Amino acid sequence: SGMDRVVLPGFYGATADGHVRTFSRGGSDVTGSILARAVKADIYENWTDVSGFLIADPRVVSDPKVISTITYEELRELSYMGATVLHEDAIFPVRTAGIPINIRNTNCPDAPGTMIVSDDNDEVSGYTITGIAGKKGFCAINMQKAMMNSELGFCRKVLGVLEDNGVNFEHMPSGIDTMSIIISEADMEGKEQQVLSQIRKAVNPDHIEVEHGIALLAVVGRGMRRTRGTAARIFAALAHARINIKMIDQGSSELNVIVGISESDFAEATRRIYDMFINSVE
């Protein structure tokens, strides 16, 4: 077409019948991502009002550092746990095309911001972790039954009860005779007694209870794969603050460690982990 530059609207468009509709919040992020893929861009610059992703929530940690480089996989882990700068749907179009995203600040245009790169990128920061994120508002269904590990289909039956009631589970730590299911409080609202009754009928546990007021805190970073003792440092940071860990989960990718703690300990736990991995290395 001979055009060097094209300006397109990012937050509204036309429906199939020609009506103009505005997109939901973050819609322009998605538009930019789709256009970047369509023109096979070398990079997608997303200009916003922050200088990239921060290692921790600035409402909890004072003046947290900016993440210089983050992979798509790390970003998804942090976004799932509540870290938000870029609309989640804006990631997929450029991720599949291998196009990096640069988050930049319109109010501070000289700041390099954060580069979001492919998952096989070997570039790492000077820190073991990439980011810390978490959410409150979870509960745990704790079950105990003798010889649980020998009972065929126990887990399937419990999860079937949750599915029948439209309840999604987040994590499921277990032992030989114990099992806990971490669930969003919002999903359980108005369903708790019905779910417990159906679980009792399905698997007849020796003991079952619901523990409320749980927060989940995720420590994410590809640097953890090549660093020994990361989990030990997380636990030590919390132990020194006398914070009790209710649940531990680590994926096989070694990309993240998730701990369950009391909601009242959420802010302090975040600060202690940040101090352990960021402030202590400076």
For every predicted segment, state its role:
Residues 1-282:
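C-terminal catalytic "cap/lid" subdomain
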